[in-house]
């Protein structure tokens, strides 16, 4: 024995923080392994919560449920794209195990469905952001559904509908409220020099 101990250390890089439905928090690293939270450091990573039934035993472990694997796949896709990494703040899993994304800009929910065809879904969302939102406005939609192939379904906010109806009525009322005297020409000749 040569009295030499060799130690290899590799640091895990968390890319996702999951808060499961059992009120357990844990990170998932870049390799898809669950790791416990640190008492000394909080990683600034994408958060996922909702109906995620992935158990956590407090130690490094693999992902066991299909929904956790889909959430990881989605988070990995988002972190590798600078636009979506800046735009998406949170992943939420609803009771039907459908993935929703919460953006940093805008109040709408982005319904992703599952983690299939992420390139196509995010490309469709990009086109919607580029073409529809500049015309309609960022607060127009309460949800943007990108889970279907080759289509984006936007559901308008009820308040936006009411605002546009009220704006149309206000415009019509303002046209009616213009007094007739503003449109008539006065025939006052007292100031004309002869």
Model-derived features: where do they sit?
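Charged, solvent-exposed interaction patches on well-folded alpha/beta domains
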Residues: 2-194
């Amino acid at each position: 024995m040569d009295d030499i101990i060799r130690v290899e250390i590799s640091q895990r890089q968390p890319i996702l923080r999951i808060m499961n439905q059992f009120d357990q928090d844990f990170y998932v690293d870049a390799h898809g392994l669950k790791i416990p939270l640190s008492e000394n450091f909080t990683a600034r990573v994408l958060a996922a919560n909702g109906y995620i039934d992935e158990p956590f035993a407090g130690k490094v472990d693999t992902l066991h449920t299909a929904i956790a694997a889909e959430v990881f796949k989605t988070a990995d896709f988002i972190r590798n794209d600078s636009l979506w990494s800046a735009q998406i703040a949170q992943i939420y899993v609803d009771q039907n195990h459908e993935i929703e994304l919460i953006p940093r800009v805008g109040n709408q929910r982005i319904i992703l469905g599952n983690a299939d065809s992420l390139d196509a879904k995010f490309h469709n969302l990009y086109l919607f952001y580029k073409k529809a939102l500049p015309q309609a406005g960022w607060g127009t939609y309460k949800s943007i559904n990108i889970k279907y192939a080759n289509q984006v379904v936007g559901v308008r906010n009820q308040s936006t509908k009411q605002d546009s109806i009220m704006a149309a009525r206000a415009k019509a009322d303002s046209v009616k409220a213009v007094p007739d005297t503003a449109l008539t020409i006065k025939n006052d000749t007292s100031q004309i020099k002869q």
